[in-house]
Amino acid sequence: MKISKKATTIAVINQKGGTGKTTTCENLGVGLAMEGKKVLLVDADPQGSLTVSMGWQDPDALPTTLSTLMQKAMNDQCIPPGEGILHHAEGVDLIPANIELAGLEVALVNTMSREKVMKQVLDSAKREYDFILLDCTPSLGMLTVNALAAADTTLIPVQAQYLSAKGLEQLLQTVQKVRRQINPKLKIEGILLTMTDSRTNYGQQIDNLIRGAYGSKIKVFDQTIPRSVRAAEISAVGKSIFQHDPKGKVAEAYRSLTKTNY
């Protein structure tokens, strides 16, 4: 009997909203599935942005979400294989999220091994997939710490603007702290510049600034994700960029990111 390898778990993380985190999680996941990989996406954000973007427009109506599964883990209840997992037409699976996750984050504070509850939920799934991608909440609270404790690597999308670049320091300190105290194997996959505009001097300056400040310590992906109206539309259509605008520059960018780095 062939034993499948354990999935690589990637936390897509930035404590700042609007950096292209959900878009990256969705399109990297579908891109990997197009390469023949088995992919599980996990919406770890109470806003449920990834769930909505994948086509489940009313996350609050879903009977089982990440919150349900984490609550079961906290209560030492058995989680049957595949429970709560939704199947998307583009070949990826999803553990959805909704606002209940915000209440669960509060409950985590008084839980034993509170940083590792999400890891408990995902450990059984690691044998079934090649990649697990976590779309993290835009904060550095207990849910994000849980995601980092469950991850092998982190991917940091950064919008190509100065303030977004400034917030990187705090995020990197959190990653280092989790590595030191909870998950010594945690690596930083790299920084992905999103919503770039290479036609402007300002866009090029920010690109150079981030590469200059961090490039010697952390990989900054050569591939950047350009700003695009079509990419902004995908959360409303329930499809990835590969279905919505397959010949566009954003689809090409995510295709290149996937092929070159995974």
Predicted regions and their residues:
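P-loop NTP-binding core
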Residues: M1-Y262
